Structure formats: structure tokens, C-alpha cells
């Protein structure tokens, strides 16, 4: 029931445990319920040992939700990448848009399976307000919790924490106000292979 989520770097409860929960992340309330249950059922009261045991169990049940999702996919033979940008955003269905999206998607998949692998490409979509660019990226992320558009500044102390747990990151606000200096900061940011949290 408890597993270590590699993507978010936290312990999750992945099976029902007898009380209502809002999210999968193991939180303080969950710990209180678990401590009460273990005390009443088994007479266990040493919180440090219980916490250590939960850590061991979680570590033995590691999972990565994006990898798990991608590994379940089976291609049905329908070509989608070539016409995806045209279908969703009205872009030209030419070789450039096809190759750009294909490269972006291959990079996203590679990063899911090999965090920190070299991938310095950012897909930039240009279009008016309400064209669907943010929605497109959110849909590419598959689940809302794997998408973020909250990256406003790269010099923010919390920038890496904001990346944690997300697969697709939109930088629309940052790009809208970009200048030569900020473009160089973005390039430098994209070229980092190891993020420190």
C-alpha cells in the first residue's frame, strides 16, 4: 500500500487504507492514522521504528508513474505526430513541424526514463492568446499533476522544487517578456543535466 514515487521523491499510499484521502502523497494525517492503527492492532508504539519500516517498505515498492504509464502504451498504427500541431493549433503540417514535435516528444520520453540525459531543446509555440498552446502542453502531459506552467523566473530559489514531480513545463510568461539576457539564462537552464533540489 505504501510506495516510493521516484518522480515526486515522496512516499505515496497507492491502495485504499480504510479512511478517506485527498491525494496519494503520504502526509502527517496519514501517519497519525497509521500510528493509531498499529498501536491498537499490534501494540506498536515506537514512532521512529514505524517511520523507518514505512521508509523500507516504500523503498522496496518504488515506482515512476510516467514510466509506468508509457510502458502500458501500445501503438495502434495510426500516425499522430505528423498532424498533431495542425489538428490542435492550426500549424502547417510540414516536415519542420513534424520533426520539431517528434524531437520534443522523444526528449520528454528520454527524460522520463533517463533523468538528466542531454536534451537542450525547447518547443516554442507562437500564437495569440486563447490559441490553445497551454492546453496543448497540458494535454501532452496526460495528467494535470504532470504539467506545470508555474515557472516564472529561473533565478527563483524554488525553481527546481517547482520542476519536481512534473513532466511537461510551460514557460509562456517567461518567454513573453524575454530579452537577450534572459534567453541566455534559459539556454543555460536547459543545458543543465543535474538539478540540485
PLM regions and their residue ranges:
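Short secondary-structure junctions
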Residues: 4-8, 145-148, 194-197
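P-loop NTPase catalytic core of nucleic-acid-dependent motor ATPases
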Residues: 54-168
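Conserved catalytic/switch belt of AAA+ P-loop NTPases
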Residues: 183-197
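N-terminal nucleic-acid engagement/recognition segments and initiation subdomains in replication
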Residues: 1-83, 95-99
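Walker B catalytic acidic pair
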Residues: 172-174, 185
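Short glycine/serine/proline-enriched coil/turn segments at secondary-structure junctions
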Residues: 115-116, 177-179
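Residue-level signal for pocket-adjacent positions within structured domains
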Residues: 158, 169, 192-196
Amino acid at each position: 500500500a505504501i510506495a516510493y514515487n521516484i518522480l515526486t521523491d515522496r512516499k505515496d499510499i497507492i491502495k485504499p487504507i480504510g479512511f478517506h484521502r485527498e491525494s496519494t502523497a503520504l502526509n502527517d494525517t496519514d501517519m497519525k492514522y497509521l500510528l493509531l492503527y498499529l498501536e491498537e492492532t499490534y501494540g506498536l508504539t515506537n514512532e521512529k521504528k514505524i517511520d523507518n519500516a514505512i521508509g523500507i517498505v516504500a523503498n522496496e515498492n518504488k515506482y515512476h508513474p510516467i514510466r509506468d504509464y508509457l510502458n502500458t502504451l501500445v501503438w495502434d498504427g495510426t500516425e499522430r505526430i505528423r498532424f498533431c500541431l495542425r489538428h490542435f493549433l492550426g500549424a502547417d503540417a510540414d516536415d519542420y513541424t513534424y520533426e520539431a514535435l517528434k524531437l520534443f516528444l522523444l526528449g520528454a520520453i528520454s527524460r522520463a526514463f533517463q533523468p538528466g540525459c542531454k536534451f537542450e531543446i525547447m518547443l516554442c509555440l507562437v500564437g495569440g492568446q486563447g490559441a490553445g498552446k497551454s492546453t496543448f502542453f497540458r494535454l501532452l502531459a496526460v495528467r494535470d499533476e504532470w504539467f506545470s506552467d508555474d515557472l516564472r523566473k529561473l533565478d527563483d530559489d524554488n525553481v527546481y522544487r517547482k520542476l519536481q514531480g512534473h513532466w511537461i513545463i510551460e514557460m509562456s510568461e517567461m518567454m513573453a517578456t524575454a530579452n537577450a539576457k534572459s534567453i541566455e539564462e534559459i539556454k543555460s537552464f536547459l543545458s543543465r543535466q543535474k538539478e540540485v533540489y
